[in-house]
Amino acid sequence: MAVETTDTLVVGAGQSGIAMSEHLSALKIPHIVLERSRIAENWSSMRWDSLVANGPAWHDRFPNLTFEDVHPDAFPGKDRVARYFNDYAAMIGAPIRTGVEVRLVRHSQGRPGYTVTTSDGIFEARRVVAATGPFQVPSFPDIVPGDAAVHQLHSSAYKNPGQLADGAVLVVGCGASGSQIAEELCKAGRQVYLSVGEHYRPPRAYRQRDYCWWLGALGLWDEVKSKRKKRHVAFAVSGYEGGRTVDFRRLAHMGVTLVGVTRAYENGTLHFADDLVRNIAEGDEAYFEVLRDADAYIARKGMDLPPEPEAWQRYEDPGCLKEPILSLDLDRAGIGTILWATGFRYDFSWLDVDAFDEQGMPLHKRGVSAENGIYFLGLPDLTNRASAFIYGCWQDAKHIADHIVIQRNYDAYTRA
């Protein structure tokens, strides 16, 4: 089988891979993008039916193409987002090959660069960009055994309330996915329990500006790490039903029963940490901190934005917060499904290079790996807070492309 060569091979054709291709093309760097499924596959198949983007259309896009059929302040649905990326890839003429799985990347023998083994043959590339993003492999906590008498699924496999087994549902995880799915299930008439861990809960909008705008105005997109994200916590923000602040007290008053972090399972009973009150309080403080910072910014800039006193009001504490549930017999509670909205983990098993620490996490600086010629793109906090978002990965891709130009100049040097 013939070996195909290129300068840069990009793995993944989601938002990161497409952004990378645009910048490589602009700098006339030969490259190929390999995608094991379809363009923007995660948006097409690993999302539930009612999902919308977490940011408004004016913000959650690449600079050179708008959502022409979506109001700038609206939140496009998952299928529209998938179509946006397909349209963008076509617009820039991205050299994407779909249905090609990258199985192994390792150093080439006796020559610079990397040998890439795929389902469609062998490629040789001087550089490889891992643009597979943060949503690689569903993460399941090892708590409830697979043979327990309850149906279990990950949020990436959830589509709508009708697919779930009869009975109540425990949603574990309170980020954008868990909070939206819990509300959707409650509105569908299900009894819902929501396991709430540490989270960052900003206002969806405040004083006529969306939270994405406030992130930019306050310089928070550029933070290397959010002040409240000393370690990973759930990001509770959603564009669900036109965009509304995630408020767990409001969900409780709708009928959702809040519990703390899911800790253990024994003989049909789940045990929860006694941390619900603290987790809710810390989420509240993050929310009010944004309001305080926004008010100070408006005053400092002399902006004419009307006050929003109702944003400072808080729902009364529900009973489940006053007297938290610490254990739950699944059978007695009638729970037929546990839905794990517990995020994803990385899988770089195909990348056989010295670019990872002892925990298997990528070693890099702004996406430039410790291994010469290997790059990472689209990971959370790669460069700053924006890096895993559409807005941010495009900027990071430009930095990586510029670095590749410099490396190509070194490669091309010959002594006069």
Map each language-model feature to its residues.
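Flavin (primarily FAD) cofactor-binding/catalytic cores of flavoenzymes
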Residues: 2-45, 75-416
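A short acidic, helix-capping loop that chelates divalent metal ions and anchors anionic groups
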Residues: 68-72
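Redox-cofactor-proximal catalytic regions of oxidoreductases
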Residues: 41-66, 251
